[in-house]
Regions:
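Motif-centric detector for short Cys/His coordination patterns
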Residues: 1-104
Length: 104
C-alpha cells in the first residue's frame, strides 16, 4: 500500500477484492470432531480450514469456538484472543491453487 501523504491507497488484488469489490465472510461453521472449519463468503464460495491449524482454536471448547465475531476484515474470538483475517484465508487459497497438481 502507498504510505505517501496523498492518502490514496494502491490495493493489491487481494485488498481490491475485499475493500473495493466488497468480498466478505458471511458465516462460519465448525465440526470439531472432523477438524473442519468452513468459511462462507458473500460470493457463495466456501473456504475450508482445519481447526487444528490454529493452536487456540484447536484447544477451544465448543462454546469458545462458537463465540466469534465477523468483521469486514476477518473473524475474532474474544474468549480466545484469536483473530483470523480474510486476507490470510485468501492468500492460503492462492498458495493451495498454485501448489495443487493440475488435473487433465
Amino acid at each position: 500500500m502507498n504510505t505517501s501523504a496523498n492518502t490514496q491507497w494502491d490495493f493489491d488484488p487481494i485488498d481490491k477484492m475485499i475493500f473495493e469489490d466488497g468480498l466478505k465472510i458471511m458465516s462460519v461453521y465448525f465440526h470439531k470432531d472432523l477438524d473442519v472449519m468452513l468459511i462462507l463468503l458473500n460470493n457463495r464460495k466456501i473456504l475450508e480450514r482445519k481447526i487444528s491449524q490454529t493452536t487456540r482454536l484447536a484447544h477451544a471448547t465448543e462454546i469458545q469456538l462458537h463465540n466469534y465475531q465477523i468483521s469486514r476484515t476477518g473473524i475474532h474470538w474474544p474468549d480466545l484472543d484469536e483473530d483470523l483475517s480474510l486476507r490470510g484465508f485468501l492468500k492460503e487459497e492462492m498458495v493451495k491453487a498454485i501448489q495443487s497438481p493440475e488435473v487433465f
